[in-house]
């Protein structure tokens, strides 16, 4: 492998779509990514280990060569990508066209990952002598509920001074981000034939009423909390499920919501009704 471009193309050609909520996707993509990265970094002197927050889906941990008693920083991109559904190009071709590399994950985050890995390769002879150890971790599951980074933080957070995540940010340094909460709201009703809806209890209608209240009342409280860089806290209703047929009053309905919070919201959450 002769260049960072070739490295990025190789990474893109390893399909690693997050399998959560994407039926039919192979759950082995993150493992394949971890195996490749381990083979890339081990000859450079890195100590390679894997930890599995979920079965068969590892975090790849590479500790830099040199003294263990140094302060440590972390390069931490993620192994998985979002779905390829709806793409109009071959998702894993890594074709170079119009001065760009095309493919799923080319920017999020296999592009930054390739830059990090190539930087470690080019500086391999000096890594053991640096005053600070530069470790690399490839996180699994970032595009869903982030079990990889959560597991790593629980077991290793106190080992590091800071981390560079490598998300695509138009080459601007980003030092803060919104917090994230995913929640599911469920409504229970009573099923009956649609010709006599008064005999049932429509779960979708109950859910809709609750979602309206949530957006209007709780959403209004969220927007009171702002940050000079991040803007306001937000809420989004991202997915709704309910019912089986149009002529049946639904007895179950659910919605998945995404809440993004700024620091002042977390600091003052005791004041939220």
Kindly give the residue locations of the regions a language model identified.
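Short coil/turn motifs at secondary-structure junctions
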Residues: 80-82, 141-143, 190, 262-264
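Acidic-glycine-rich active-site phosphate/pyrophosphate-binding loop
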Residues: 83-97, 160, 175-186
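Acidic/His- and Gly-rich active-site-bordering loop/insert found
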Residues: 1-101, 106, 125-130
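Short glycine-aspartate micro-motif
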Residues: 72-74, 101, 161-165, 184
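Predominant activation on well-ordered alpha-helical scaffold segments within soluble catalytic domains
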Residues: 9, 38, 114-117, 121, ...
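Glycine/serine-rich anion-binding loops at beta->alpha junctions
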Residues: 99-115, 193
């Amino acid at each position: 492998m002769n260049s960072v471009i070739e490295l990025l193309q190789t990474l893109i050609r390893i399909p690693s779509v997050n399998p959560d909520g994407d039926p039919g996707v192979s759950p082995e993509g993150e493992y394949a990514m971890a195996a490749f990265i381990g083979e890339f970094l081990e000859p450079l002197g890195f100590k390679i280990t894997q930890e599995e927050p979920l079965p068969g889906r590892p975090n790849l941990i590479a500790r830099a060569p040199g003294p263990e008693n140094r302060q440590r920083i972390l390069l931490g991109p993620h192994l998985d990508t979002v779905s390829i559904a709806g793409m109009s190009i071959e998702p894993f071709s890594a074709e170079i066209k119009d001065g760009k590399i095309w493919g799923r994950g080319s920017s999020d985050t296999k592009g930054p990952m390739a830059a990090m890995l190539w930087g470690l390769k080019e500086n391999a002879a000096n890594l053991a002598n640096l005053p600070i150890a530069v470790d690399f971790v490839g996180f699994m599951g970032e595009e869903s509920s982030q079990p990889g980074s959560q597991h790593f933080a629980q077991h290793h957070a106190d080992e590091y001074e800071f981390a560079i995540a490598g998300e695509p940010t138009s080459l601007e340094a980003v030092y803060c981000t919104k917090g994230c909460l995913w929640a599911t709201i469920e409504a229970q009703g009573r099923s009956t034939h649609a010709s006599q809806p008064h005999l049932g209890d429509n779960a979708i209608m109950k859910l809709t009423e609750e979602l309206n209240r949530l957006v209007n009342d709780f959403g209004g409280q969220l927007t009171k909390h702002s940050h000079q860089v991040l803007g306001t806290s937000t809420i989004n209703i991202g997915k709704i499920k309910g019912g089986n047929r149009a002529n049946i009053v639904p007895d179950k309905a659910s919605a998945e919501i995404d809440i993004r919070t700024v620091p002042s919201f977390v600091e003052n959450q005791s004041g939220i009704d």
